[in-house]
């Protein structure tokens, strides 16, 4: 079945996903952190493929340029798939592949959709699978989001502690089972809020350490099948460079 594409950087795979999975109305475009992370993964993959001689330098260069434009906040309106979809993020991965491929084609002077020149799967997704691209991008985006959340929570911890000091002289009744129980100070209550919040910050720090482990190069089922020798090491090294602030 043929599909009429609107004027857009995404392609037919994205359009079909939009038609097949209109589930929540919450779109990939609503999560810029994830889009940026996907573009960083695509850049790292292109660099690795170029280093191994698998991707023509001319094509690789424009793929990287297009991916960097996305990282700088451009073209996000073309990431239109629903966040809830069939598969393991395949539609999200293809949305990224098509946007980057079509923008790269424009940079080469070709019309969008000239996939005989530069293809979303054959070039942008070279040596990759949704099953390593998507979880890696999600982890990068989550790591950054957690960092921002921790900053906000740390500020709240500080505010609770200050109130704990300010309210130290003020007595109140502690309550259990919806009844007055024994006395405490209002300062103790706010200090307890601070302690509980700090424990949550510490748990988030532990979670950040766990999600720094990525599976780029493992491809579809974790064995690295279809990825050439040396690719996994190359793409992980490039990914580390692009996410150095997370180290």
Language-model segments: residues:
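Conserved, well-structured ligand/cofactor-binding cores
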Residues: 1-240, 244
């Amino acid at each position: 079945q043929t599909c009429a594409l609107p004027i857009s950087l995404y392609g037919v795979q994205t359009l079909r996903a939009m038609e097949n999975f209109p589930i929540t109305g919450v779109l990939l475009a609503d999560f810029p952190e994830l889009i940026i992370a996907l573009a960083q993964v695509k850049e790292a993959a292109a660099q690795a493929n170029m280093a191994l001689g698998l991707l023509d330098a001319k094509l690789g260069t424009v793929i990287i340029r297009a991916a960097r434009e996305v990282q700088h906040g451009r073209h996000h309106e073309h990431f239109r798939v629903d966040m809830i979809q069939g598969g393991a993020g395949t539609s999200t991965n293809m949305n990224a592949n098509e946007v980057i491929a079509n923008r790269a084609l424009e940079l080469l002077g070709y019309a969008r959709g000239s996939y005989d020149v530069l293809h979303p799967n054959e070039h942008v997704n070279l040596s990759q699978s949704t099953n390593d691209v998507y979880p890696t991008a999600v982890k990068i985006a989550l790591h950054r989001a957690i960092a921002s959340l921790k900053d906000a929570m740390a500020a709240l911890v500080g505010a609770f502690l200050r109130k704990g000091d300010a309210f130290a002289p003020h007595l109140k009744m502690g309550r259990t089972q919806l009844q007055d129980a024994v006395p405490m100070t209002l300062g103790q209550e706010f200090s307890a809020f601070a302690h509980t919040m700090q424990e949550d910050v510490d748990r988030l720090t532990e979670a950040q350490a766990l999600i720094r482990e990525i599976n780029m190069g493992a491809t579809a089922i974790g064995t690295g099948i279809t990825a050439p020798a040396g690719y996994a090491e190359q793409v992980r090294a490039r990914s580390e460079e692009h996410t150095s602030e997370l180290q």
